[in-house]
Amino acid sequence: MERVLIVNADDFGLSKGQNYGIVEAYRNGVVTSTTALVNGEAIDHAAQLSRELPALGVGMHFVLTLGKPVSEMPGLTRDGLLGKWIWQMAEEDTLPLDEIAHELACQYQRFIDVFGREPTHLDSHHHVHMFPQIFPIVARFAAQRGIALRIDRQTVLNADDLPSDLRSTQGFSSEFYGEEITEACFLRILDASAHRGEASLEVMCHPAFVDNIIRQSAYCYPRLTELEVLTSASLKAGIAERGYRPGSFLDI
């Protein structure tokens, strides 16, 4: 059975260092896809780079936890900014869902305006689209537009509630992160997916060169380690040996 592997680099547009790291991991490594924060400080730079790489799949990284929203969100922002208090609001079930749905549509249009095309797929910064209150909004939005969606099936309460026409990979892994940034970890992810019989798999990553913006992130220097592993010749060989075909969300 042919298996499609999508190695998706999150945070395109966050900074120039992030952008250059993703491009390096695509040109000289195993990254096949990326997702862009349309409110990122380097989003225009990301769009410029992507025009030189037409085969790189570029999706949208829906943002509700960082920077300024595209639309007015008085119910979610503090001093005009988004932040991680969204977790507390989700626990208290006080999320402004109408504002979130509107912001999703506005970020989507912003993506089209900047990149000149629709995104290949949707996911989100800090996985907020997997919140039980937010997931139905994003799932319906993706299904209506015929674009794929990152789904962490371990967190979906009821897979039967997914729209029948919603596209996603059969498997998803966020394990290549933090203390587990090794070639062995990456290949274990592939082996586990193959053991489950999944025909398609997305592996999330965050390769980057460190700049002043990345230094402000709690997840800083591990991005350099990710870049080193993702551009290793032995990892590329290990993927090929396992029969995976590199692809993007346009291949599922």
Curated annotation (Swiss-Prot):
Listed GO MF terms: chitin disaccharide deacetylase activity; deacetylase activity; metal ion binding
Listed pathway(s): Glycan degradation; chitin degradation
Biological processes per GO annotation: chitin catabolic process; diacetylchitobiose catabolic process; polysaccharide catabolic process
Keywords attached to this entry: Carbohydrate metabolism, Chitin degradation, Cytoplasm, Hydrolase, Magnesium, Metal-binding, Polysaccharide degradation
First-listed, main subcellular location of the protein, grouped into a coarse class: cytoplasm
Family annotation (InterPro entries): COD_ChbG_bac, Glyco_hydro/deAcase_b/a-brl, YdjC-like
Mitochondrion is among the record's keywords: no
Reaction it catalyzes: N,N'-diacetylchitobiose + H2O = N-acetyl-beta-D-glucosaminyl-(1->4)-D-glucosamine + acetate; diacetylchitobiose-6'-phosphate + H2O = N'-monoacetylchitobiose-6'-phosphate + acetate
Residues spanning the membrane: none
Keyword Magnesium: yes
Subunit text: Homodimer.
NCBIfam families per UniProt: PRK02134.1 (NF002559)
Similarity field: Belongs to the YdjC deacetylase family. ChbG subfamily.
Protein name according to UniProt: Chitooligosaccharide deacetylase
UniProt organism field: Salmonella newport (strain SL254)
